[in-house]
A protein has these predicted regions:
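A conserved beta-strand-to-alpha-helix junction within the catalytic ATP-binding
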Residues: 2-17
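Acidic ATP/Mg2+-coordinating residue in the GHKL
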Residues: 84
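Conserved micro-motifs of the catalytic ATP-binding
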Residues: 1-2, 40-43
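Short beta-strand/loop element within the Bergerat-fold HATPase_c
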Residues: 66-76
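Short conserved segment of the HATPase_c
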Residues: 89-101
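Short alpha-helical Gxxx[C/S/T] motif in the catalytic ATP-binding
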Residues: 112, 116
Length: 144
Protein backbone atom coordinates (compact mmCIF):
# COMPACT_ATOMS: atom_id res chain seq x y z
CA UNK A 1 0.00 0.00 0.00
CA UNK A 2 1.16 3.52 -0.76
CA UNK A 3 1.78 5.90 2.12
CA UNK A 4 2.15 9.57 1.21
CA UNK A 5 2.33 12.77 3.19
CA UNK A 6 -1.20 14.15 2.98
CA UNK A 7 -3.17 17.07 4.39
CA UNK A 8 -6.01 15.43 6.33
CA UNK A 9 -8.20 18.49 5.74
CA UNK A 10 -8.13 17.81 1.98
CA UNK A 11 -9.06 14.16 2.55
CA UNK A 12 -11.98 15.20 4.73
CA UNK A 13 -13.18 17.69 2.10
CA UNK A 14 -13.09 14.80 -0.42
CA UNK A 15 -15.22 12.73 1.97
CA UNK A 16 -17.68 15.60 2.40
CA UNK A 17 -18.07 15.95 -1.36
CA UNK A 18 -18.72 12.21 -1.53
CA UNK A 19 -21.41 12.27 1.17
CA UNK A 20 -23.07 15.56 0.17
CA UNK A 21 -25.99 13.80 -1.55
CA UNK A 22 -26.81 11.92 1.66
CA UNK A 23 -26.72 15.15 3.68
CA UNK A 24 -29.00 16.92 1.20
CA UNK A 25 -31.39 13.97 1.08
CA UNK A 26 -31.79 14.10 4.86
CA UNK A 27 -31.66 17.91 4.94
CA UNK A 28 -28.63 17.98 7.27
CA UNK A 29 -25.93 20.57 7.78
CA UNK A 30 -22.29 19.53 7.76
CA UNK A 31 -20.06 21.97 9.65
CA UNK A 32 -16.29 21.58 9.19
CA UNK A 33 -14.09 23.18 11.86
CA UNK A 34 -10.55 22.77 10.54
CA UNK A 35 -7.18 24.24 11.50
CA UNK A 36 -6.05 27.06 9.20
CA UNK A 37 -2.73 25.30 8.68
CA UNK A 38 -2.25 21.90 7.03
CA UNK A 39 -2.69 18.86 9.27
CA UNK A 40 -0.28 16.44 7.65
CA UNK A 41 -0.16 12.67 8.14
CA UNK A 42 1.57 9.87 6.29
CA UNK A 43 -1.25 7.75 4.92
CA UNK A 44 -2.74 5.53 2.29
CA UNK A 45 -5.27 8.07 1.02
CA UNK A 46 -7.75 5.59 -0.44
CA UNK A 47 -7.96 3.60 2.80
CA UNK A 48 -8.03 6.56 5.15
CA UNK A 49 -10.69 8.25 3.02
CA UNK A 50 -12.78 5.09 3.33
CA UNK A 51 -12.34 5.06 7.12
CA UNK A 52 -13.51 8.69 7.40
CA UNK A 53 -16.38 8.12 4.97
CA UNK A 54 -17.65 5.17 7.02
CA UNK A 55 -17.90 7.33 10.14
CA UNK A 56 -19.34 10.35 8.32
CA UNK A 57 -21.97 8.18 6.63
CA UNK A 58 -22.96 6.73 10.01
CA UNK A 59 -23.17 10.21 11.51
CA UNK A 60 -25.40 11.37 8.65
CA UNK A 61 -27.62 8.37 9.17
CA UNK A 62 -28.28 9.17 12.83
CA UNK A 63 -28.05 12.98 12.95
CA UNK A 64 -31.15 15.11 13.50
CA UNK A 65 -29.92 18.41 12.04
CA UNK A 66 -26.16 18.65 11.92
CA UNK A 67 -22.85 16.86 12.01
CA UNK A 68 -19.69 18.69 13.05
CA UNK A 69 -16.29 17.61 11.78
CA UNK A 70 -13.21 18.93 13.53
CA UNK A 71 -9.66 18.52 12.30
CA UNK A 72 -6.67 19.93 14.07
CA UNK A 73 -3.13 19.35 15.14
CA UNK A 74 -2.74 18.85 18.86
CA UNK A 75 0.44 17.84 20.74
CA UNK A 76 2.07 16.37 17.64
CA UNK A 77 -1.01 14.41 16.62
CA UNK A 78 -3.74 14.87 14.06
CA UNK A 79 -7.09 14.87 15.85
CA UNK A 80 -10.25 14.28 13.82
CA UNK A 81 -13.62 14.44 15.60
CA UNK A 82 -16.90 13.60 13.95
CA UNK A 83 -20.00 14.30 16.02
CA UNK A 84 -23.70 14.10 15.28
CA UNK A 85 -26.72 15.46 17.15
CA UNK A 86 -28.65 12.17 17.15
CA UNK A 87 -29.61 9.94 20.06
CA UNK A 88 -26.04 8.78 20.68
CA UNK A 89 -24.89 5.19 20.96
CA UNK A 90 -26.68 2.96 23.46
CA UNK A 91 -24.25 2.45 26.39
CA UNK A 92 -24.52 -1.34 26.17
CA UNK A 93 -23.51 -1.21 22.49
CA UNK A 94 -20.52 1.14 22.89
CA UNK A 95 -18.01 -1.64 23.74
CA UNK A 96 -19.00 -3.61 20.62
CA UNK A 97 -19.41 -1.14 17.77
CA UNK A 98 -15.93 -1.83 16.34
CA UNK A 99 -16.40 -5.62 16.46
CA UNK A 100 -16.49 -7.36 13.12
CA UNK A 101 -20.03 -8.17 11.92
CA UNK A 102 -21.60 -6.25 14.77
CA UNK A 103 -24.40 -4.04 13.50
CA UNK A 104 -27.21 -2.09 15.09
CA UNK A 105 -28.96 -1.82 11.74
CA UNK A 106 -31.14 -4.76 10.80
CA UNK A 107 -29.60 -6.34 7.74
CA UNK A 108 -26.44 -4.24 8.02
CA UNK A 109 -23.30 -6.36 7.63
CA UNK A 110 -21.51 -4.22 10.20
CA UNK A 111 -18.05 -4.37 8.67
CA UNK A 112 -17.94 -0.58 8.35
CA UNK A 113 -16.62 0.36 11.77
CA UNK A 114 -14.48 -2.78 12.15
CA UNK A 115 -12.80 -1.89 8.86
CA UNK A 116 -12.44 1.71 10.01
CA UNK A 117 -10.64 0.57 13.15
CA UNK A 118 -8.38 -1.73 11.12
CA UNK A 119 -7.43 1.07 8.73
CA UNK A 120 -6.75 3.53 11.56
CA UNK A 121 -4.58 0.91 13.31
CA UNK A 122 -2.56 0.40 10.12
CA UNK A 123 -1.84 4.12 10.30
CA UNK A 124 -0.60 3.72 13.92
CA UNK A 125 -3.66 5.60 15.12
CA UNK A 126 -6.60 5.09 17.45
CA UNK A 127 -10.34 5.50 17.02
CA UNK A 128 -12.64 5.96 19.97
CA UNK A 129 -16.41 6.38 20.25
CA UNK A 130 -18.27 8.15 23.03
CA UNK A 131 -21.46 10.09 23.65
CA UNK A 132 -21.72 13.82 24.17
CA UNK A 133 -25.24 14.72 23.21
CA UNK A 134 -24.98 12.61 20.06
CA UNK A 135 -22.27 10.16 19.07
CA UNK A 136 -18.67 11.38 18.91
CA UNK A 137 -15.97 9.54 16.99
CA UNK A 138 -12.40 10.63 17.62
CA UNK A 139 -9.54 9.50 15.41
CA UNK A 140 -6.00 10.31 16.50
CA UNK A 141 -3.12 9.85 14.04
CA UNK A 142 0.60 10.57 14.25
CA UNK A 143 1.70 13.70 12.37
CA UNK A 144 4.13 13.10 9.52
Amino acid sequence: SDFHSTDVRELLYDCLRGTEHLAQQRNLRITPIFDDDPVTVSCDEIHLRRAFTNIITNALRYAKEEIIIECRQEKGKAVIRIRDDGEGIAPELLPHIFDRFFSTRKGGAGVGLALTKEIVSLHRGTVHASNDGGAVFEIILPIG
